Amino acid sequence: MSTTPPPQSLTGDERTATDGRPADDGAFGWLRALGPRGRRAFAGAFGGYGLDSYDYFTLPLSMVALAAYFGLDSGQTGLFTTVTLVVSAVGGALAGVLADRVGRVRALLVTVITYAVFTVACGFAPNYETLLVFRALQGLGFGGEWAVGAILVAEYASARHRGRTLGAVQSSWAVGWALAAVVYTVVFSLVDDDLAWRIMFWTGALPALLVVWVRRRVHDAPEAAAAREKSAVKGSFAAIFRPGTAGAPGLLRVTLFAGLLSTGVQGGYYTLATWVPTYLKTERDLSVVGTGGYLTFLISGAFIGYLTGGWLTDLLGRKRNIRLFALLSAVCIVAYANIPSGADTLLLVLGFPLGFCMSAIFSGFGSYLAELYPTAVRGTGQGFTYNTGRAMGAVFPTTVGFLADSWGVGGALVFGAIGYGIAALALLGLPETRGRELA
């Protein structure tokens, strides 16, 4: 059964008015403007990305228990993240091509099923090597879900509201993270660590429930699907690396600088997402409950940061929003990692702005990358640049793991600030796209 309904124009309710009628700029105007089909697509992408986040954080939250169970050093534990992110680049690029060739919803289903199956498999791993392989295979689905879900929603959203809409989708990452932190606190408080980490992975079966609903209720945006079907070129890697000519602009420059931007932002983000739980438990000597409590502040900041960043990217523009929060994120990392021993209240309070800034920078990513590419190669371009950046950014958590043996986790965390500097520089080679319509 096709996941794309017959092509038809979107109604006035499904697009922000552009014919002189007042636009709906209320708090939830962006959601009303999506229309019924768009809201179902939003729900599917929100749920998929939130559960993607939940499955991802089962590992960082269980890292201390895993290291003790398998007798791992910091470098080996950091390798988990690097392998996941590197393989996710392959998965994301392939999912982007798949989305351009067979449709957004079908590709979304493949990614969700993949990461759910291999997350559960991680819970049965008998040794470090097997767990590393399963975690890598999980990355195939993990890499593709965001790119495909973001494109699906972006093609329903109007240019006026696209930043806020995609920022709201991004906020589901914080929801999944919070859910993982709650489950972690409960499971590790009630069950011995040697079994608790396995239970965390087994709960990763939750996304399977989402697949049934998405398969029945969510469809590709009609106008974008029609444009994709008419295009002679679908999902072409050659197209996104084609240099410009005097008569036609190419996409090579966009692809290179967008990949560099993604590298910087994700290098900084995954440094924090991977190592902050370990930092709190090992260097700040917090209990399981204490670590969960401190993470609550950071995750709350992240959730609000996603929503606020989405609003600001529509107000300020895509580039200004990213540049602003790249600077603030770098400052927050340095401040957080250098909090004096014993200043636990300050550590708690600073978790909020750290989570806020490191997430607000992501809010414009979904809309910005989607707007940089034409419909026929949007999935390929967004999937490739976002996930290549994820693979290259994966070097950061591993580097922190090796540096932690001599610098301590807190000192090594500062390395993540370099990523945000790279992101700010990459913006120099990219255009502003706020207000660009997608067809």
Q: Where in this protein do the model-derived segments appear?
A:
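Conserved MFS/SLC helix-loop-helix module at the cytosolic interface between two early adjacent transmembrane helices
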Residues: 90-126
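C-terminal ends and interior cores of transmembrane alpha-helices
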Residues: 113-126, 327-341
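Helix-breaking motifs and short loop linkers at transmembrane-helix boundaries and internal kinks
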Residues: 71, 103, 124-130, 317, ...
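Central cavity-lining transmembrane alpha-helices of secondary-active solute carriers
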Residues: 82-95, 296-308
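Cytosolic juxtamembrane N-terminal segment immediately preceding the first transmembrane helix
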Residues: 2-54
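Cytoplasmic membrane-interface "Motif A"-like loop-to-helix N-cap segments
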Residues: 101-111, 315-326
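Helix-loop-helix hairpin linking two adjacent transmembrane segments in secondary transporters
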Residues: 169-216
